[in-house]
Every structure is written in structure tokens, then in C-alpha cells.
Amino acid sequence: CPRCGTALSSHEVAQGYKEVEEKSVYVKFPVSGEENTFFLVWTTTPWTLPSNVALCVNPEESYVKIKADDGFYWLAEALADDLFEKYEVAEKVSGKQLEGKKYQPMFDWAGVENAYYVTCDGYVTLTDGSGIVHIAPAFGEDDAKVGRAYDLPFVQLVNNRGEMTEQTPWAGIFCKDADPLVLEALEKKGQLFAAPEFEHSYPHCWRCDMPLIYYARESWFIDMSAVKEQLVANN
């Protein structure tokens, strides 16, 4: 919780879920070496995009490069009809075949190496979105797992108060309040494909009702079940 300054256990997080409606975003990541070609990426947390270091696809799923009115797009074959009314399939591959394919970073404020390419992991589903997700290892368990598997750099452009850092143009602004500013920046760069409203369940602090953020930090947790018998005996 950025307000309380404390990490929460999974049990505490489970106590504060609320249904919220906020903007998700489909982002156009330019594919390196391919003119007017983009990876179409979906996220419900635009504030994490400045900390992006990779993209991720499901290695077992089918992906297509489609020709649309305004360019070429890579996305999951099963989701193409949901996002485009009219298109032609130019190429079809497995997710595994996209592994290692490079793209141009949206924001390169961190100046990192060994970054900005496609990774693979089975956690990517085709339930929503485009079948391609962005990876920011500092903000999520799955992202961190992929980051370790590919030895990706650790970029955390949000401080422990939940504010955007000085490396971004939005220093001091609470990360979730920065969402519309990130969308505005994407639109100016011509990389905003769409920003539909998305209703989903989001965790809030059970103490203060503040929206929680998934944030990598050093923490200590006590395994109370391991000392349960001793606690009962002492009381």
C-alpha cells in the first residue's frame, strides 16, 4: 500500500478487492527493421509502460501479422476479429517463433541493455486483449518470473510512495493518476491504438481503502503457521 507504506500478504490483499472501471490501453510497439509494422499490446496498467523492458507471448498459441488500413500488426490469431473489422493475414507463426524479435522502446528513459524483445511464457492467455502483454519486472509476479528467466533489466520508475520518479515527465504524481498522462503521451507519439473502458476486480488496502500496486521491494514476512503451536502454548 503506497499510503500505509507496507507490503501486504496475499491474505490481506484478498480482503480488499473491488470492481472498478478504468481505461485499458492497446499500444503499438514498432517492430525493429520492419517499416510500419507493430506489435499490438494490451495492458490495464498504463502507468507501468514507462518501466517496460520486454513483450511476452504464449509460445503454444498461433500469431498472425495482419495488413490493416494503417499498417501491419502482430497479434494472436484468435483475437484478430475482435480488434479489426477488415484485414488480410500476411504471415502466420507460433508464439515461439516470435521469441527474440526486437521492437523499438516506447520510452527509453532508463537506457538499459538486454531489453526490448519478445519473450515467451504460458501465463499469457487469449481471454482478453491481443495475446501480447508487456513486461515490467518490478510490477507483478508473472513479470518478475519472466524477467528472471530472460535476465531482463530491472526498471522501477515508481518510488515506494507510488509516485512516478524524476526520470519521467510526471515526477511526484501518484502512478494510477498518471494513467491519462501516459495515454496522452502515447497519442502524441502515434502509438495509441485504442483505450477502451475495462471493468475488472482490483485490490485495495483493507486499512485505508487506497488502491494497491504490485511493487517489488524488500520485505519480511513471518510464517505464523510454523509457530502456531508455540503461540497457543504460551497463551
Segments (PLM) and residue ranges:
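Protease-associated
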Residues: 54, 61-132, 141-144
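Residue patterns forming the tRNA-binding/recognition surfaces of aminoacyl-tRNA synthetases
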Residues: 1-50, 100-102, 111, 123, ...
